[in-house]
């Protein structure tokens, strides 16, 4: 397991790095006092979970020996790594001007420039110990997150999770949907008394819908649309793509179509989840 310690000058991108690490599966803690690192590591060792902890000038120990001692108290199952983010002085000044935030050392009645310089001196012990130093001066938020994934996971893109969910329009459109497709125009199994009690997960309903050309055409055109834009969506720094398929009640057509799309992209090696809102409500 990895204990990633994220440090760096204020404004260099520590919050961005912590969010990216969280997306990679790290248990993240912002501004944990150094003396509590062993306690956190021991707790997470029981869960077999890697962790990322940010340390900045606000929770730096007064003596470097405190940090070194904390490192010696980590359980053997953890491999500590220190990531230090930095940026040039002018970039940090510009970022603070853009966000209009106060520097952590501004409470000492220092000017922004003086606060940045003093912070550099205070963080030098960590910088000199860093396993990886990243200069974010010319990086966007997305580029920093991408670099971390490349360095830590050995691949450029994070794995996008495609979520196909069915719903009923009479219950409302899901607010988490990135795309919403309406299948109320497709033949409706509801009007067949034998199929009405069933759902789109049942074979008789699937056979009914499978007999109709318009159902095949809709599924083909929808998956083709998603395939065309999926490469760009995968590089757009997102973790999930939620595709909602809606019919009137969310029981037959939308369930079947959502499952067909999920099976198709799953067979193409994508990370896929499927859920059925109306069916989940019926189980409650």
UniProtKB/Swiss-Prot annotation:
It comes from the Bacteria. The keyword Plastid does not apply. GO terms for molecular function: ATP binding; GTP binding; RNA binding. Residues 266-284 are annotated as: RNA-binding. The keyword GTP-binding applies. InterPro entries: P-loop_NTPase (IPR027417), RapZ-like (IPR005337), RapZ-like_N (IPR053930), RapZ_C (IPR053931). Transmembrane segments: none annotated. GTP binds at residues 56-59. Keywords: ATP-binding, GTP-binding, Nucleotide-binding, RNA-binding. ATP binds at residues 8-15. Belongs to the RapZ-like family. RapZ subfamily. Homotrimer. This is RNase adapter protein RapZ. It comes from Serratia proteamaculans (strain 568). The gene is rapZ.
